[in-house]
Each structure stands twice: as structure tokens, then as C-alpha cells.
Amino acid sequence: MPQVVEVLVEGGKASPGPPLGPAIGPLGLNVKQVVDEINKATKDFEGMQVPVKIIVEDPKKKTFRIEVGVPPVSQLIKKELGIPKGSSEAGHSPVGNLTMEQVIRIAKAKMDQMLAADLKAAAKEVIGTALSMGVTVEGKDPREVQKEIDEGVYDEIFANAEE
């Protein structure tokens, strides 16, 4: 059975130091080779924390493969807005504003990992994360926007997004 190591690394900037080196060193793999593969696979997510799985297929031959996950919703929101971090006073001092199109783009990227049954539910999950980060949606409190989604205010945008 293959061994699996899961780590969270900064896209395109994995290094042989912690958390990677200590996790893969004992597996007998060439740490530099693994780090190079991870950096190549995560270069599109530069500046974001990305979940990575290192699957050791054959420890004797030292063969492995890398699986790159999608960054957490909070990382996607930060990238979309170009902000370094969420608000330290969420609900009092917003740090950015997402449009519904941006919310839908993030929801589509994360859909496979979410428990949401449809795009609207996934968008509401993204909006919930925006709330906890101190980010407004369409210039409003995220809770208000979630209610508006339930009321059908954004149905046309969702219909266009699902085409």
C-alpha cells in the first residue's frame, strides 16, 4: 500500500525545510526532487497556501507522484481581492468587496471539495467564509446577500454561470 504524506505549502515556494523535509526524509525519497516537482505543480498558486499529497508508489524504486489540491476558500478570496489577510475585526472594518461573479468563480473552483449540492449552495459557503474574513459581497453584509440568494435576487447570474 502506498504511503501518503499531506502538507500545506506556499505555491511555487516549497523548500526542503519544515514541513516538507522532515515529512519526506524518512521515506527515502530525494527531497530536492520532490520539492522541485511540488514547485512545478503549484507555480500557478503563487502566494497561496496549497494542499499537496505526496504518494510514495514504490519505496524501493523511490517513485512518487504529487497531487495538488485546490487552495482553501479563504486563500482564493485573498487572491481574488489581492489582499494579504482578512480583517482582524470582521464585521466592523471590511478589507475588501467581492462581486457575485467572483463568488461564483471561487465556488466553481472549490465545488468538488464542498458538501454543497449545487452552485447556489457552494456560493453561500464562499460568502460565509467572506463574512468571517471581513469581506463584503456586492457592497453588502454577506448575511444579507445569502438571504438575497434564497429570495432569487441573483438567479440570472447563477443561470448564466451554469451554462
From Swiss-Prot:
Entry GO terms, CC: large ribosomal subunit
Stored InterPro entries: Ribosomal_uL11, Ribosomal_uL11_C, Ribosomal_uL11_C_sf, Ribosomal_uL11_CS, Ribosomal_uL11_N, Ribosomal_uL11_N_sf
Keywords, sorted A to Z: Ribonucleoprotein, Ribosomal protein, RNA-binding, rRNA-binding
Record has rRNA-binding as a keyword: yes
Record GO terms (molecular function): large ribosomal subunit rRNA binding; structural constituent of ribosome
One Pfam family named in its UniProt record: Ribosomal_L11_N
Entry keyword Metal-binding: no
GO biological process terms held by the UniProt record: translation
PROSITE patterns per the UniProt record, alphabetical: RIBOSOMAL_L11 (PS00359)
SMART domains per UniProt: RL11
Disulfide bridges in this chain: none
Function: Forms part of the ribosomal stalk which helps the ribosome interact with GTP-bound translation factors.
Subunit comment: Part of the ribosomal stalk of the 50S ribosomal subunit. Interacts with L10 and the large rRNA to form the base of the stalk. L10 forms an elongated spine to which L12 dimers bind in a sequential fashion forming a multimeric L10(L12)X complex.
Record PANTHER family: 60S RIBOSOMAL PROTEIN L12, LARGE RIBOSOMAL SUBUNIT PROTEIN UL11M
Family: Belongs to the universal ribosomal protein uL11 family.
Family matches, as HAMAP family: Ribosomal_uL11
Name of protein: Large ribosomal subunit protein uL11
